[in-house]
Every structure is written in C-alpha cells, then in structure tokens.
Design a protein with these regions (language model features):
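Short, charged/polar surface micro-motifs in flexible loops or helix N-caps
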Residues: 43-45, 53-58, 66-73, 82
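Beta-strand/loop substructures that line and gate deep hydrophobic ligand-binding cavities in soluble
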Residues: 77-133, 139, 148
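A short, structured loop/turn motif at beta-sheet edges
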Residues: 13, 40-44, 67-71, 91-100, ...
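Hydrophobic pocket/interface hotspot
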Residues: 15-20, 26, 48, 65, ...
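Hydrophobic ligand-binding cavity/cleft-lining segments
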Residues: 1-44, 149
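Hydrophobic/aromatic beta-strand elements that line small-molecule binding cavities or substrate pockets
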Residues: 5-7, 36, 50-52, 61-67, ...
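A general secondary-structure signal for short beta-strands and their flanking turns/coil
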Residues: 2, 43-45, 58-60, 85, ...
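Short, cysteine-centered beta-strand-loop-beta hairpins and adjacent loop/turn segments enriched
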Residues: 53-60, 109-115
C-alpha cells in the first residue's frame, strides 16, 4: 500500500513543522484525533500512542516518531496496531511564501492472498488517506488563520 496526501500552505515552514511534529497537541488542534500519549523518548525520537476516528469509526496505533528539523522531515514507524510496519514520512518544502507539505505512507502486508488488497483498499483508501487529508487540511486552516470548520 502506498498513499500520498499533500497540501500547499501559505506560512512559515518552521511554524508548520512545529505544529506537525508536536503530535501530543494534535487532539487540541485536530478534531478527528481522540488522543495522543507520549509513552517514552526525547526531543528527537519518541514512542507515541495515537487514536483518531474516521467519520466515527475509531482507530488506534503506536508509532515511533523521529524528527529531523534540519531537513523539515518527520518520520513514523508504526509498531503496534493493524498498521504495524507502516512507514510514514512528512516532507515539508519551502517555496517562497508557500510551503508544500506531503505525507507518504507505505505498508506491505504479505498475508496471501488478500493481504495486499486489505492493505490498499481498507487501510490505505478508507482510513490512512482520509485521516491524513483531514490532518493536512486542518493544519492549513490553523496556520493560515481560517480556524477549523
């Protein structure tokens, strides 16, 4: 399974990076996030338990988050939950007054014969892409000062 979600935000790359990397603040900022608990770690690498919902359907996972502020990258490896093994990378690229933000999710399920289909259509299309799209859209609204609708 491979998904990509992106948005262009008019704002400061460091401010956007700070908001995107502070996952413990997401439930306050992103209505579709139920909770985020930092389980262990330090300023650049930590273990987090995250819970969101996809239009009322609850999902939960645990991931290792690694921050690379110099290159404006955020990495996650899902270590528990149905998405275990998923690799996620946030890419932030400045372009004048704009910042292009892209989230890439990759998951390989080898459960023959339907594992790849479940990974792509159920996990990828129905959940990952939906939640990532809402996350990017809401961060854009906060940064650009439009509030959350």
């Amino acid at each position: 399974m491979h998904t990509e979600n992106s948005v262009t935000i008019c704002g400061n790359i460091n401010q956007i990076y700070a908001m995107a990397s502070a996952v413990e603040q997401w439930p306050r900022l992103l209505p579709h996030y139920r909770w985020v608990h930092v389980l262990s770690g330090n300023a650049t690498e930590r273990l987090v338990e995250m819970a969101a919902h996809r239009d009322g359907f609850p999902v939960r996972w645990t991931a290792r988050q690694r921050l690379d502020p110099v290159h404006h990258r955020i990495y996650f490896t899902h270590v528990r939950g149905i998405s275990r093994g998923m690799e996620v990378t946030w890419f932030l690229e400045a372009d004048g007054l704009l910042v292009h933000v892209r989230i890439v999710h990759d998951l390989t399920w080898r459960w023959p014969p339907i594992g790849p289909l479940i990974a792509h259509y159920i996990i990828g299309e129905l959940f990952v892409s939906n939640i990532a799209s809402k996350t990017l859209r809401t961060i854009k609204q906060h940064i650009e000062g439009h509030g959350v609708s």
